[in-house]
């Protein structure tokens, strides 16, 4: 669980007021959430907006993720899912709004590297692994250790690191294939390996973009099991279009539309929402 700073409430209030002044707003917009939500959440977005060349990609987005929570994010193309993740990871800075991590850290003030070091990891839809290295070496390269490839590969692996690698390979079900080249893996297995590489960075929050895309039915089912196992010790945001996969996850769903939250709740509830049916499910 994430340890929260006892002084986070006052610090977070100062961050919000500073953002208001910085963007020239005469009055503080009404917050969607309570102060308790700000300081108790692992991730807190409130009133976040960003525009690109006059197009408002995110408009007044408010969202909280609790420590140890897995959340599914759905929405049609252009709903703002990718931009939301870009904001969380520091790739895109919002025009206005509050983005806090761990109750006290203002993510809008940090660059991508600092946010990654803080404990936010992102997995893109297309897996990126070192094809000509073994599965085990891919995990070793991702561990928090000396950063150059040569130093990492030839570094004396301590017992604790060896155990960590074994644990990760067990979680992603690739322990028996540890000596295989990553390039020989199936698409689904490469997805699992990249998730394992993300785990090697000890993230508090994982952002996972369409993990089931291009997978067989069997791989999709295994991926749901994998993410549920990971969510026992981490917070996870899953962006996905496969409703069957989301049903397997069995988690709260947030529906985005035109850059803001349209609906939230269990999948059956949001699927029955008339507005969701109209703008997302297409019937």
What are these regions (language model features)?
Residues 2-7, 35-283:
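Glycine-rich phosphate-binding loops of nucleotide-dependent enzymes
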């Amino acid at each position: 669980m994430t340890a929260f700073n006892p002084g986070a409430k006052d610090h977070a209030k100062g961050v919000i007021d500073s953002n208001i002044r910085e963007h020239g707003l005469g009055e503080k917009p009404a917050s969607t959430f309570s102060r308790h939500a700000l300081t108790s959440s692992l991730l807190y977005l409130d009133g976040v907006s960003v525009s690109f060349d006059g197009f408002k990609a995110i408009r007044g987005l408010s969202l909280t993720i609790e420590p140890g929570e897995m959340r599914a994010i759905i929405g049609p193309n252009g709903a703002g899912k990718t931009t939301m993740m870009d904001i969380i990871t520091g790739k895109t800075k919002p025009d206005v709004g509050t983005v806090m991590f761990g109750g006290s850290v203002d993510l809008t003030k940090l660059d991508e590297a600092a946010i990654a070091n803080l404990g936010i990891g992102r997995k893109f839809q297309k897996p990126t692994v070192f094809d000509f290295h073994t599965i085990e070496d891919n995990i070793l390269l991702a561990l928090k250790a000396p950063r150059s490839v040569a130093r990492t590969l030839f570094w004396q692996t301590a017992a604790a690191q060896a155990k960590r690698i074994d644990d990760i390979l067990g979680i992603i079900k690739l322990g028996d294939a540890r000596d295989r080249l990553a390039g020989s893996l199936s698409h689904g297995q490469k997805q699992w390996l990249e998730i394992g590489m993300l785990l090697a960075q000890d993230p508090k929050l994982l952002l996972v973009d369409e993990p089931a895309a291009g997978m067989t039915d069997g791989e999709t089912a295994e991926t749901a099991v994998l993410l549920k196992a990971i969510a026992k010790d981490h917070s996870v945001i899953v962006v996905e279009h496969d409703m069957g996969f989301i049903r397997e996850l069995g988690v709260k769903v947030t529906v985005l539309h035109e850059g803001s939250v349209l609906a939230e709740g269990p999948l059956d509830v949001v699927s029955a929402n008339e507005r969701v049916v109209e703008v997302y499910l297409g019937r």
